[in-house]
């Protein structure tokens, strides 16, 4: 009798997975997908990265003025220019092609994060890609998904302060709200990694800004304040 539960366990797990995956797919189809139209697909990508990258390519300022009327128009750039510079090559393509490549990069980021954490169960990958945050992130083209593999690397390399510190610095320079990673390093007494993370953040912020002549560096804090109002 003890063998029967053992034989049924894989079947039970399979049923749970199918039910969970189906539920998440239905939620994505009926909750997230209807929210997107032709004007909203890639909305975050276009406003925060694509349009600023085009401006950089043409030698124009990538940031709007730090006034409410400018911030309320579309979805303007608010973060340091590191990711904008990385997107510049994509702007040589059409918008549709650039967005398609960006979406593939986002999917690769989610899959890569699980691979970095040595997740081998294919069901975890399916669940992750069907989750509402990921589906919404893909729909908006939000760069936050790119922070997922960086956070995974920070965890995997947590005992290697040079690599861990650099990765945390790169994550924060990409999107400033990743700064709690430094708090985590300090809380776990990884002081050298935390110090390097601070230095790396400064380097990854200042160097890209230097490439665009520090355009918008003094107004960006004002942009962040205005956007929160």
Spell out what each predicted region is.
Residues 162-186:
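Membrane-interface alpha helices of multi-pass inner-membrane proteins
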Residues 1-164, 188-229:
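Primarily membrane-embedded glycan-assembly and transfer machineries that use lipid-linked glycans
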